[in-house]
């Protein structure tokens, strides 16, 4: 392994790449992600020259099986991307990697030659760009999950929007997919991405038709939540129920929880159940623990006793 090769936590790429039409598969895009990770935005690249990026073959093989590597590199070399400018109604076609070399001179590396124009394109982030976690990206085994992840991270970063809308035709175009109706697109693209996001990215992706022409879906509205958002909402819902509930019923429920899940002394139980402030704190912290917002390293009883101020002089 090349000791000088290091993966950075996040990738940065222009939004025009995120929203470009690409014909690459999941393995090609993993290699692309590894290459983008090696871009140095503080370096003064010569804009008149091509540049060679070197990826250790052993590093690439962690994410792309050796038997698929040549075909993936061939596709990266041969397939174009189309970059759209909707405002000006124009588009450009680019070949990012016109040349590559595999293990030249037994180097143990893949050498990707990036043209000067392609390098300028990749480095031109502007004020708005896409930032995503490389490790999460490399876990996806679906190209559609990869593409949706980039779009979601672009929207979250640039617009801080957890709700946004895209035309179905546009998504079908940039994803280069043949799923030409909403039902198939939802099943093959969106549902897969939603499952992958939940398992690998701590994101909850929801979607629904936004606009229709007759029965045909024209655009899709996306709603994004993190798993942490959902946990906070669960705590808030439980606290709202607590505030509305009959006080006597609350005491009975809290006492039952203490007996089943905690080992307070009788004096501590009495203090909690007979103090509205302590009882409210107990219910909220218990909810945060149960919903995963608080990770307990010792014991729930010890943590809550400390939070309630027991043992202080």
What does each model-identified segment do?
Residues 1-260, 283-313:
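Charged, alpha-helix-forming regions
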Residues 267-270, 293-295:
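Charged, low-complexity interaction regions
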Residues 274-282:
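Short amphipathic alpha-helical heptad-repeat segments
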Residues 263-265:
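Short, charged helix-capping/linker segments at alpha-helix termini
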């Amino acid at each position: 392994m090349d000791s000088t090769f290091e993966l950075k936590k996040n990738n940065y790429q222009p939004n025009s790449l995120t929203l470009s039409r690409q014909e690459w598969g999941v393995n090609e895009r993993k290699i692309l992600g590894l290459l983008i990770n090696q871009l140095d935005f503080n370096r003064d690249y010569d804009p008149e020259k091509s540049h060679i990026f070197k990826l250790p073959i052993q590093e690439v093989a962690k994410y792309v099986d050796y038997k698929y590597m040549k075909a993936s590199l061939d596709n990266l070399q041969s397939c174009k991307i189309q970059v759209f400018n909707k405002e000006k109604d124009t588009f450009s076609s680019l070949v990012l990697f016109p040349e590559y070399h595999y293990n030249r001179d037994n180097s143990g590396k893949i050498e990707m030659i990036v043209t000067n124009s392609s390098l300028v394109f990749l480095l031109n982030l502007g004020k708005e760009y896409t930032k995503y976690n490389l490790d999460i990206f490399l876990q996806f085994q679906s190209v559609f999950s990869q593409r949706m992840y980039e779009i979601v991270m672009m929207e979250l970063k640039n617009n801080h929007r957890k709700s946004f809308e895209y035309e179905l035709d546009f998504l079908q175009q940039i994803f280069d997919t043949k799923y030409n109706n909403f039902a198939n697109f939802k099943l093959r693209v969106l549902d897969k991405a939603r499952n992958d996001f939940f398992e690998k990215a701590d994101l909850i992706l929801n979607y629904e038709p936004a606009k229709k022409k007759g029965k045909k879906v024209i655009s899709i509205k996306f709603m994004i939540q993190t798993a942490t958002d959902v946990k906070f909402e669960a705590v808030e819902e439980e606290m709202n129920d607590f505030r509305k509930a009959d006080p006597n019923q609350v005491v009975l429920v809290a006492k039952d929880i203490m007996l089943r899940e905690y080992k307070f002394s009788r004096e501590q139980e009495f203090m909690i159940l007979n103090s509205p402030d302590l009882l409210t704190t107990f219910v909220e912290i218990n909810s945060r623990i149960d919903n995963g917002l608080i990770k307990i390293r010792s014991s729930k009883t010890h943590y809550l006793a400390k939070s309630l101020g027991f043992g202080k002089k």
